[in-house]
Regions:
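Short strand-coil-strand connectors
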Residues: 25, 48-50, 324-326, 335, ...
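Low-complexity, glycine/alanine/valine/leucine- and proline-rich hydrophobic stretches
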Residues: 318-369
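Metallo-beta-lactamase
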Residues: 1-25, 28-138, 275-290, ...
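Conserved small/polar residues in nucleotide/adenosyl-binding loops
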Residues: 392-398
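A glycine-rich beta-turn/hairpin centered on an aromatic-Pro dipeptide
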Residues: 290-336
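Glycine-centered positions in the ABC transporter ATPase nucleotide-binding domain
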Residues: 374-377, 381
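Accessory terminal helices/loops
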Residues: 1-4, 89-97, 104-295
Length: 399
């Protein structure tokens, strides 16, 4: 089936006030900004005509993620809770249906107010209890194994851990306020996993004996421990099939036990890859139309990401850049291979001056000749400077 064309149109209007009322196609909507909740930019929307409250992903019929396993900035559980309560204060007494990006709507004013209060309580509890234990000197993993939701909150279906989990959300709060370092100096500059595993196996000695013991622990249901010790054996020797298969069996059991769909998928995917290997999927090409919606500064940051700065470390270049469709000028420097830029006055001693539309910048970043042809209007000075950049474009350019 066709999935259509993915593209992006920049917003024609931006909500900037804490609450703002706008008519959209004749329908009055009240927008409530909720930044740094489920995402850095988020908002709830109340529709008075229907007494309907859209909660985006701030209330989602399940425990959500303060940290998402796919990778993203850690979310602020305290702000999340407070914005839900603000929505309750603003709209709670006049709402008859609440709906959101995932899961089912909720009807009835009393039900809705309980739903919002209980959801806010979950995120507030995770935030406050984690900080309490941080102040007592416990580490991230210790706290994740200490905290349990209050029994009454744990019994509510829409706060269950079907997506986010208490354990990884606790670790998210720890990460936000304390970072990765747990004050144990042996963790400052740890050996990478393969080197560590090889040394540990050297100390353990007979790996067959280790596997024999691990199988006994597997039979006792100690799946997490079995996964951890066999993971060490696999890192030390990826060709050790007995270790791979036992690790896969342990991960599979952990997946079967997981209430969270995200955890279950992670466990079962890990088990599959241990048994069958991993595939070399091609890099995603992304949507040029979507990328063209980026600001010029974001596009230049993207260009810096796409350049292999290690290979460029001997290069020192100065480029005057005019972005004609944004009516903006920048001074770019490749300083010891690092791309830095500012909107300061152009240099009289620049290696090159490039006049281009935004598409040209994106074309260089993605090594896309079609976009370069469409965007780059003029290059003065060192005409090979773009070729130099393209020569050192990394694999990230294809993503």
């Amino acid at each position: 089936p066709s999935s259509g064309t993915t593209t992006y149109i920049s917003p024609s209007y931006e909500v900037k006030k804490a609450t703002e009322t706008i008519k959209v196609d004749g329908v009055e909507m009240v927008f409530q900004l909720t930044p740094d909740t489920e995402s850095p930019a988020e908002m709830n929307t109340y529709i008075p005509k229907y007494k309907a409250l859209w909660m985006a992903e701030n209330c989602s019929g399940t425990m959500h993620n303060l940290y998402t396993l796919r990778g993203a900035e850690v979310r602020d559980g305290n702000a999340w809770a407070q914005y839900i309560m603000e929505a309750k204060e603003l709209f709670g007494d006049k709402t008859e249906v609440v709906f959101q990006a995932h899961n089912w709507p909720h009807w009835g004013n009393d039900v809705i107010n309980d739903y919002m209060a209980n959801t806010a309580s979950v995120y507030k509890y995770i935030f406050s209890q984690t900080l309490m234990y941080i102040n007592q000197g416990y580490t991230s993993t210790e706290i994740a194994n200490m905290i349990e939701l209050p029994d009454e909150l744990n019994k509510i279906w829409y706060t269950r851990q079907y997506y986010g989990t208490l354990k990884h959300n606790v670790k998210a709060v720890y990460q936000k306020y304390m970072g990765w370092y747990d004050e144990n100096p042996i963790h400052l500059d740890e050996l990478e996993p393969t080197e560590y595993s090889k040394k540990l196996v050297e100390y353990l000695g007979d790996t067959d004996k280790v596997l024999e013991m691990a199988k006994k622990d597997f039979d006792k249901g100690e799946y997490q421990w079995v996964a951890q010790i066999t993971n060490t054996l696999v890192y030390a020797d990826p060709e050790n099939k007995d270790a791979r298969y036992l690790c896969a069996d342990a991960l599979e059991q952990l997946g079967y036990q997981a209430e969270s769909g995200a955890w279950r998928n992670a466990y079962l995917t890990g088990a599959y890859e241990l048994r069958n290997g991993t595939k070399n999927y091609p890099n995603s090409e992304g949507s040029g139309a979507t990328a063209l919606g980026m600001s010029t500064e974001t596009m230049l940051d993207y260009l810096g990401i796409c350049l292999d700065e290690k290979k460029l470390e001997d290069q020192n270049l100065v480029i005057n850049l005019e972005v004609t469709d944004k009516n903006a000028k920048y001074l770019l420097r490749i300083n010891h291979g690092v791309l830095i830029y500012s909107q300061e006055k152009w240099s009289d001693k620049a290696d090159a001056t490039i006049k281009t539309k935004s598409a040209g910048i994106l074309g260089i970043a993605q090594n896309n000749q079609k976009l370069m042809d469409a965007g780059i209007e003029k290059v003065e000075g060192n005409s090979d400077i773009i070729k130099t950049c393209l020569l050192y474009t990394s694999d990230a350019a294809d993503e």
